[in-house]
């Protein structure tokens, strides 16, 4: 049943830069992506993405309003 779920409002975005990793075990990538469709076409956002990602990948965003906070400096 979950495989049949389709997001009508999803917008494609292309990964143009990988800023780093976050999360307790580094499983989340922070990326900059360029919106390819919808009302925000051409806008560049910073988003957190779970799972493997590389430059040029297309990701589907349910909404394009939110941006991720910048990664902070790591304490030693």
Curated annotation (Swiss-Prot):
Keyword tags: Ribonucleoprotein, Ribosomal protein
Residues making up the signal peptide according to the UniProt record: none
GO biological process: maturation of SSU-rRNA; ribosomal small subunit assembly; translation
Molecular function, one GO term: structural constituent of ribosome
GO cellular component terms, A-Z: cytosolic small ribosomal subunit
Keyword Ribonucleoprotein: yes
PANTHER family on file: 40S RIBOSOMAL PROTEIN S28, SMALL RIBOSOMAL SUBUNIT PROTEIN ES28
HAMAP family assigned: Ribosomal_eS28
Family of this protein: Belongs to the eukaryotic ribosomal protein eS28 family.
Name of the protein: Small ribosomal subunit protein eS28
Organism from which the protein derives: Methanococcus maripaludis (strain C5 / ATCC BAA-1333)
Highest classification ranks of the organism: Archaea, Methanobacteriati, Methanobacteriota, Methanomada group, Methanococci
